[in-house]
Amino acid sequence: RDGYMDCPERERSPYLGDAANQISETFYSLDENSYEMTKKTILTLLGWVTTDNIIPLRSPSQTLNECPAQTLNFLTVVREYLLYTGDSQTVRKFYPLMINYLKLWEMGDDGCIVYRPGTFMWTDWGEGADDKLLQECWYYYALTSALDIADRLSIAGDTQFLEGRIQSIESGFDAKYKKAGGFSSGTSYDDRANALAVVCGLAGEEDYALVSQVLKMQEK
């Protein structure tokens, strides 16, 4: 089938979480013919986004479920698609969906986002995922990806929104999540969330030793 999935014997449409992970792999494991499947995945979403700007977990689908972490992950991959392919036409069509989706989040008094559970969390397999920290990092990563896309495509109308939220999260992140044992929204430390804090840029080089101790102690 010409779609991204992890269970081809029962899945008929692409799941955004699977698509995000697999698209990133296709850029260096397959030839340029694979770009067409990624393009199809991006453009299919244009016809399935809901009237309240929710991007569904899979499309086409009779059940328009939302999993925010997976959708935010997918938004970051749209930027990768632009960088690898130069297909500005496809990304320009999808860009408004990105902005409208990012506007679904409210900002708290602490400068960080107000957590949205979506239809279900489904952040990762197993137990112990720090869903709130992961969503914060994925949201920030999606913001910076959208800002880079806007810059590359010379779209200026959303700069204030994107830069404002980026700066807000940067100013409030450490106070909310940084603790003696690592980054956490509670009392336990998730290696995935700490690693993502580094990948998205919210954890700087001065935090690498702190994150390293989490990676050495936890294994999810």
Give residue spans per PLM region.
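Leucine-rich, amphipathic alpha-helical/linker segments
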Residues: D6-P8
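Mature extracytoplasmic enzyme cores
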Residues: R1-G3
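Active-site-proximal alpha-helical scaffold in enzymes
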Residues: E11
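Active-site core of glycosidic bond-cleaving carbohydrate-active enzymes
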Residues: P14-K220
